[in-house]
Amino acid sequence: MIELYNGDCRAFLSNYNGERFDAVITDPPYASGGATLSERSASTSQKYTATKKACPFPDFMGDQMDSRSWLHMMADILALARVQCHDGAVLVVFCDWRQIPLLTDAVQWAGWQWRGTLVWDKLTSRPQKGRFRQQAEFVVWASNGKLPIDRPVPVLPGVFRAANVQGVQRIHQTQKPEEIMRQICKICLPGGRILDPFAGSGSTLAAAEL
């Protein structure tokens, strides 16, 4: 069953007194997309839409923060989320290459045990003449304390390959493919509860229910 709450996830998590969660799987605003303050302060449609046409998807908040503000926000939210999780729960968070150092700091400051970094290979994205193609995003994962080796969870890949969502299926500027989210959700215990503080297009919610 999907339960959707609209509001500041920090306020929600601070007051939540329901069942504990078995996994946190989420895709926060990256707050990167530029080398300078002016570039990072651009709208999300300017940063993440690879076309000169008007972007049909609305801009979203939280993507214009400086690095310290973003680190503080993420550490705060991940700490609040961990309190609402069972021991041994799993954390999975998307990011781009610029934010890996900050995100891994936030994960550990929040009390999670960092376990590794995964790769989403987007296949043919972002060609740049004279440079390596920026076709990957990254996923930091961790656990709330020990992670028993005998959990009823299969061996999962460390690299996920799928193109960006296109056409009529796309409803969000930074939407993650549901096929990838279905694979990632398998890290959660069968029948477990998954928390997504940054719901976005709802890919995690849809994948978790399948």
PLM region spans:
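Core catalytic lobe of class I
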Residues: 1-210
